[in-house]
Regions:
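Carbohydrate-active catalytic/glycan-binding domains of CAZyme proteins
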Residues: 1-197
Length: 197
């Protein structure tokens, strides 16, 4: 999928193309409001190809295999979007980011789609990891606990769970629970389908 399409559009509005022509898909889209931009950041997973025929995938300089990246666009009205920007390209396959904001930091859960390690710090394949940053649109070229979260995405944790499509939801005070000791989200929940883990 390269564009989102309405199939029930009686008004003739059948969709808006947001991805580039050489992208193989526009998977797991999510939008998050960015106060500093006064707009939504819409991010999604893609596999890039060498041209718009999408017959030859771009391959990783680390693994030699095709891999997935994440891009983002900015919108205020969900009718007009900026051109997509490469958000996460580490030369390792990653998909399905979800974002929450707690205090001044954005926290990003993403799945490592590699079968094994994805660099020096993400050591397990097919599992979700956690990063944080004060800048939602900061780009990522390497996962590292040494990245300054003031300007980039700092790796905090990995091997969280082996699932795709994580989602973080803010709970009401009456239903809040502590997800992980020492982490600042006592009122956040990550739903997990345990029937497949």
């Amino acid at each position: 999928m390269v564009n989102w399409t309405r199939t029930n559009a009686a008004d003739g509005d059948t969709g808006i193309k947001i991805n580039v022509d050489n992208a193989g898909m526009t998977w797991a889209p999510e939008a998050y409001w960015d106060d500093s931009l006064g707009a939504y950041v819409v991010f999604f997973s893609s596999r890039m190809y060498t041209d718009d025929t999408r017959s030859t995938a771009v391959t990783s300089t680390n693994t030699g295999y095709a891999y997935n990246v994440l891009l983002y666009c900015i919108t205020r009205d969900f009718k007009t979007f900026t051109e997509p920007v490469m958000w996460q390209d580490t030369n390792y396959s990653r998909i399905d980011s979800t974002v929450i904001k707690v205090g001044d930091y954005y926290y990003r859960f993403t799945k490592n789609e590699e079968s094994g390690a994805a660099g020096s710090y993400i050591t397990n394949g097919k599992s979700t990891f956690l990063e944080r940053s004060k800048v939602l649109t900061a780009t990522t070229e390497e996962a590292s606990p040494d990245t300054d979260p003031e300007t980039g995405w700092q790796l905090l944790d990995q091997r969280i769970l082996p699932f795709e499509g994580p989602e973080a939801i803010k709970l009401t005070p009456e239903t809040s629970i502590r997800m992980k000791q020492g982490m600042p989200w006592s009122s956040w929940l990550i739903p997990v389908d345990t029937s497949r883990t």
